[in-house]
Swiss-Prot record:
It comes from Bacillus subtilis (strain 168). Gene3D superfamilies: Ribulose bisphosphate carboxylase, large subunit, C-terminal domain, RuBisCO large subunit, N-terminal domain. GO terms for molecular function: 2,3-diketo-5-methylthiopentyl-1-phosphate enolase activity; magnesium ion binding; ribulose-bisphosphate carboxylase activity. Pathway: Amino-acid biosynthesis; L-methionine biosynthesis via salvage pathway; L-methionine from S-methyl-5-thio-alpha-D-ribose 1-phosphate: step 3/6. This is 2,3-diketo-5-methylthiopentyl-1-phosphate enolase.
Amino acid sequence: MSELLATYLLTEPGADTEKKAEQIATGLTVGSWTDLPLVKQEQMQKHKGRVIKVEEREGTAASEKQAVITIAYPEINFSQDIPALLTTVFGKLSLDGKIKLIDLHFSEAFKRALPGPKFGVYGIRKLLGEFERPLLMSIFKGVIGRDLSDIKEQLRQQALGGVDLIKDDEIFFETGLAPFETRIAEGKQILKETYEQTGHKTLYAVNLTGRTADLKDKARRAAELGADALLFNVFAYGLDVMQGLAEDPEIPVPIMAHPAVSGAFTSSPFYGFSHALLLGKLNRYCGADFSLFPSPYGSVALPRADALAIHEECVREDAFNQTFAVPSAGIHPGMVPLLMRDFGIDHIINAGGGVHGHPNGAQGGGRAFRAIIDAVLEAQPIDEKAEQCKDLKLALDKWGKAEAV
C-alpha cells in the first residue's frame, strides 16, 4: 500500500509526545480508533495513519520542548493532487497550536501524477548554450508608471551588459502602459538586436498575471508569441495553479516561481511550512523551472541553513528535472564569491540594484558581475581582476566585498 510521509516540528507538544503523535495520525485519517468495534477496526485499518517516528529535542528556549514526528498517511485516503494532500496532512492540523510541516516524502506513484520542471537546469542551459558557470539574471526596476519606451531601453541596457536572463518585477501588472503581449513582442525584437550586436543570448521572463480563470489562455498566447519564460507569483495563486500551467502541452515555456507571499507561510519557526519544502521540493514537483528565494546575505536574508536547504531540494537526485535555484534580494558583485561557494555552479545570480545602481549604469553592472564570476571560476584574486576590469573596481568601491556568513 502506498503511503505519503509527513514530518512535523511540534513545539510544546504536551506531556506525552507519543500520544500527541498518535492523535494526529488517527485524527487526520479515520478520526477515531479505540471507540470503534473490532470488526470496524479491521475494515478501517488500511485507512489509518501510522506514527513512524517521534524524536524529542530541546527547543530554542531553555524551557521549551520540541519534537519531530513523522506520520505515514495511506494514499488511498486522498486523490493524487496537492490540494487534497495538503488538506489531509496539514489542513485543520495547521490550526492546532505550534506545528510546522517541515517535509513530505512522496511515493513514486504520487510523483507520477506531478509534472516537475519542463526544462530544469539542463534545459535552461541548453536554451542559452551556457553550461560552465552560474547564470546571471537582472530585474526591471522602477518600471511602475513607465511606458513601453522606458521598458525597452531598460531591457536593451541590461542585455548589453551580458546578463543571461532578465525578468519583470513581480509587481508589474497589466495597467495599459506596457501590455503583456506587446512586452513579449517588443522584447523579442530588442533581444534579437542585442544578440546580433554582441553574440550573447538573453532570455526575458514576462510576468504572467490576472485572474486565475484567464491564466492558461494568457500563457498559451505568450507561448504563441515566442515568450522565453513566464514569471509567476505562485503563492498568490497556489501550487495547483502553477502545476496546471506546467503540465499544459500548449504552454511549452519555462516557469519562474517568485516567492512573493511565501513569507506568510514559512517565516515562523513554529507554524506553517519549512522553506525547503515550500520553495524547494513543492515548487520543483509542481513544475517550477526556477525558484527564487532570499539569499543568506542580501537585503532580505534567510538563515544560511534554510537557503542551502532550498537549493538542495532543487537539485537533489529525484524523479524530476532539477530546478534552478535563484538566491536573491540585495545582491551585488561583491557577493558573488559567497554565492558560488554556497550554491556552486548550478544556480542563478539574481540582481536588481546591483546592476542598475552601478556608476556606469546597467551595462556596467552586468559587466562587473560577469568579471567577478570569471575571476572566481579561474581562481584569480578579486583585487587583481578589479584592476583589469574598471566596472568591477567601481562596483567593489561602491558596495565592497560581502563577509562570509
